[in-house]
A protein has these predicted regions:
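Short acidic/polar hinge/loop motifs at secondary-structure boundaries
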Residues: 95-122, 226
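Short, acidic, small-residue-rich periplasmic hinge/interaction motif at the N-terminus
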Residues: 21-54, 74-76, 82-86
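N-terminal periplasmic accessory domains that precede
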Residues: 61-64, 103-106, 130-153, 165-167
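Transmembrane beta-barrel wall of Gram-negative outer-membrane proteins
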Residues: 159-194, 206-252, 272-288, 437-439
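Outer-membrane beta-barrel signature, preferentially recognizing the C-terminal barrel domain
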Residues: 269-277, 329, 386-388, 430, ...
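Extracytoplasmic beta-strand/coil segments of soluble accessory domains associated
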Residues: 62-98, 123, 127, 132, ...
Length: 697
């Protein structure tokens, strides 16, 4: 099923803090640090140096960047291939060529002592196509050797085992013209769980079954990574990166079901997904003619076995019923990309070409439990196995320049040609040609105010598993597979306005509108249903966020961060013909946070609360709204110098957010047939105790 997160995914939960900074950037007679994107006396933007963050005792670049007033980190979108830049963080004036490491991971590996400065500039004014709005350029150096570590255990009193394995350690340094970085990271680990009652009612509202279910998960994702940078004298620079990762995911659910006229039953669900993946990436940039040429290569491979088993066993000893679904997928991606940049006609030009080859080879099996032998017996399931591949070629040309001292633009245009091939039971080959590009305008009407407008045409990446059939045993659903699935295309319109409030902080307004074609959702396929395309859909969002520094009011060291996100969407339901919102769409979000760094001490404390509301997910015969909340709140206390380390204790879920579900299943098409049953779930999560230790060596 398609999982649609917030349209305003560009807005990350704010944890930013006002700091003292130069609003005018570096003076013209000050040599720019190598890697700077602010060159010359006419450079516009804000510059933050390490002294601006001293009160927070940051351990790494992430700690520093999250304190910049009015700036929210936006990670790179999940795009086809490498494409043009989509995030809003640069590293020494360049964007990373890896797809596996998010911005958070890259920033946390850079010790705060290595950061020279942070430049907040207008993305459209840079010579990197795809950027718009506020962009942070992190200018840093490598020491001869430095290292850092963190450990973030967690404990819950209900249904969940303690988490003791979350943490990371990394080292980086420099030897002559070579910088190196090594890391071991298991931050993407978790222990989760919840338990409580579920009530099943019929169409008349009468209780027909009561359940008590408890579930918990274990997840660990250790990853070892290495990165080399060769930076000789001159205009050449090269990067080489690699990682290897194992992922271990286990889900266990045990339920006791009671229904009139039936023996009590015990239901168990067991899911296992133990995978591995690796990535090799590199780039080399050098001067050529009037400009510079950058060559990029990347190879990713992932082995992804998955098993789900569901058994319903009566306690009176009568025969149990059950099913098992398993699949083994092997995913590969190979990308080659070239970018040539040069100045001409008073602006910056770039021509780029990219070839990307994606593959999936998958084998699925379906079993049912034999009531006599108690063994799982395989059933025919040929539509779940097969291969999917896409060969894609892209060419783009971009041009950007300043129109006035306060107005700049960037124009990008091009197209892609792709061939989608499916093998197996429903083999099919199709080819597509799609134009794409963007126009960005940026205006700074006065100091402390910057506005940007971006219009973008893009093509979304497909999940190759959606081409093949799959069973979802927990709810008794299945996708029949769809060999005619097409990538979603969309026009995206984004407005961003940032205004400095001086010593009081800053505020930001974002407006987003998406006009989508071939929208990906669950649609009728043959006699069943599967992931497919809806001709038209749209969504809109308005986001207002602010950082308020209360130092001028006499509350030294106190700041408040707040954001409100309101969204709406629309499409014509492929089953009912009626208009509705997108499946699983986040239509509202609000967050407020308070942090107090106590002056003259190493102590800090804070509060945070957030609320989110989601639309239901839709299938042919059901609606399903699953959420946690309504409000998540946390409180923390932190000391920034415990034997040279930063130590934090935090209580999360302080106001008892619950795990909820409201699911209605119909006899036929929802809304056009009687209700078969309604499922109402209310499970306890309980408080979460989080502890963290961060240090360096």
């Amino acid at each position: 099923m398609r999982r649609v997160a917030s349209l305003a995914a560009v807005v990350v939960a704010l944890t930013i803090q006002p700091a003292l900074a130069d609003d005018t950037g570096a003076p013209g007679d000050t040599p720019a640090v190598e890697g700077s994107v602010m060159q010359g006396a006419d450079a516009q933007g804000q510059v933050y140096v390490p002294a601006d963050f001293a009160r927070y005792a940051p351990r790494n670049a992430y700690d520093m960047l999250t304190q910049v007033p009015g700036f929210s980190i936006r990670d790179n979108d999940e795009v086809r291939g490498l494409g043009q830049a989509t995030g809003n963080v640069l590293f020494n004036g360049t964007r990373p060529s890896t797809k596996s490491d998010d911005i958070y991971t890259l920033l946390t590996r850079i010790p705060a002592a290595n950061v020279e400065r942070i430049e907040i500039v207008d993305g459209a004014g840079l010579d990197i196509p795809g950027l718009s709005g506020q962009v942070a350029n992190l200018v840093f150096r490598a020491d001869s050797f430095s290292g850092q570590f963190s450990w973030k255990p967690q404990a819950r009193p209900h249904y969940t085992d303690p988490l003791l394995t979350r943490g990371d350690i990394s080292v980086r340094g420099r030897k002559g013209t070579v910088e190196y970085e090594l890391g071991l990271n298991n931050d993407d680990s978790s222990r989760s769980g919840a338990g409580g009652p579920t009530v099943i009612t019929n169409g008349a509202g009468e209780v027909i079954e009561r359940r008590k279910d408890i579930w918990n998960t274990h997840q660990d994702s250790p990853k070892v990574s290495a990165r080399l940078t060769w930076d000789p004298k001159g205009d050449s620079i090269a990067h080489l990166g690699a990682h290897y990762q194992r992922k271990y995911y286990h889900y266990d659910e045990d339920g006791y079901w009671v229904a009139p006229g039936l023996p009590d039953r015990i239901r168990t669900i067991r899911e296992t997904q133990d995978t591995w993946n690796y990535e090799l990436s590199g780039d080399y940039q050098f001067g050529l003619g009037p400009g510079k040429l950058k060559l990029i290569g990347l190879r990713r491979v992932s082995h992804e076995p998955y098993t789900q088993e569901v058994v319903l066993a009566p306690v009176d000893g009568s025969a149990a019923v059950g099913d098992r679904f398993s699949q083994v997928g092997d995913v590969g991606e190979t990308i080659g990309r070239g970018e040539y940049q040069w100045p001409m006609l008073g602006g910056d030009w770039e021509i780029s070409g990219e070839a990307a080859f994606n593959t999936l080879d998958n084998v699925s099996r379906l079993y049912s439990l034999d009531p006599l032998s108690g063994d799982f017996v395989e059933e025919p399931f040929p539509e779940g196995s097969g291969g999917v591949s896409e060969d894609r070629y892209e060419a783009m040309l971009s041009f950007g320049r300043k129109l006035t001292d306060r107005l700049s633009f960037q124009l990008t245009g091009g197209a892609e040609h792709s061939t989608l091939t499916q093998t197996g039971m429903s083999g099919l080959e199709r080819s597509f040609f799609r134009p794409k590009g963007s126009l960005t305008l940026s205006w700074t009407p006065e100091q402390g105010v910057d506005l940007s407008l971006k219009i973008k045409r893009r093509v979304r990446q497909l999940d190759f598993y959606d081409f093949l059939a799959r069973a979802f045993l927990g709810d008794g659903n299945n996708n029949s597979g769809n060999n005619e699935l097409r990538p979603q295309q969309e026009w995206r319109y984004e407005f961003e306005g940032n205004m400095s409030l001086g010593k009081w902080g800053s505020t930001k307004v974002q407006l987003v509108y998406v006009d989508a074609e071939d929208f990906v959702d669950i649609v009728p396929v043959g006699a069943g249903e599967s992931v497919g395309n809806i001709p038209k859909a749209w969504a809109a969002a308005a986001v207002v966020s602010a950082t308020i520094n209360l130092d001028p009011a006499g509350l030294k060291g106190v700041r408040i961060d707040a954001s409100v996100d309101l969204e709406t969407s629309s499409l014509r339901d492929p089953f009912t013909g009626r208009k509705r919102q997108w499946s699983g769409f986040q239509d509202s979000y609000a967050e407020v946070a308070l942090r107090h760094d106590i002056p003259g001490s190493d102590w800090a404390w804070g509060l945070n609360a957030n609320y989110a509301h989601y639309q239901p997910n839709y299938r042919r015969n059901e609606t399903n709204r699953t959420w946690e909340g309504p409000v998540f709140a946390s409180v923390f206390v932190e000391n920034k110098d415990v034997l040279g380390m930063t130590v934090r204790a935090q209580l999360s879920n302080a106001v008892n957010a619950r795990s909820r579900r409201e699911r209605t299943v119909y006899e036929g098409v929802r809304g056009a047939s009687p209700v078969l049953f309604h499922e109402s779930r209310d499970r306890l999560i309980g408080p979460i105790f989080v502890f963290s230790v961060r240090g360096k060596f």
